[in-house]
Amino acid sequence: MKEIVEYTDYRKYILDYYEERKRCSVFSWQKFAQDAGFSSAVFLKYVCEGKKNLSIGSAGSVASAMGLAGYEQTYFVLMVSYAHAKSDKAKRAAFEERCALAKAHMMRVLGKDEFDYFK
């Protein structure tokens, strides 16, 4: 699975997380929703399908259920905030904060030439 800072859509991140967990172990939407504190077993599935929205308030609990902490959790909440922003000013603020966080934590994988240079 890609690093969270490579995502711009929280729905896509949740879906990729679910598919990765499902591929590696016994995991269900019900278990995922339960871990995140939702009573509806399919709520997060509906979020991924665009039928429901994840509130900014519950974004933290979903992030925790996915094992995100620190800047990763903050980035996830910012993706949700950006999606819910009504005004251009709020959207721009969430976008700029998300970009700054991504830039601060983005890792670059060295290519063969760079690796050979630093050997």
Residue ranges and their predicted role:
Residues Y18, V47-C48, S58:
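DNA major-groove recognition helix of helix-turn-helix
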Residues Q30-K31, G60:
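Residues within the helices of the helix-turn-helix
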Residues L110-K119:
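Internal, conserved structured core segments that host functional sites
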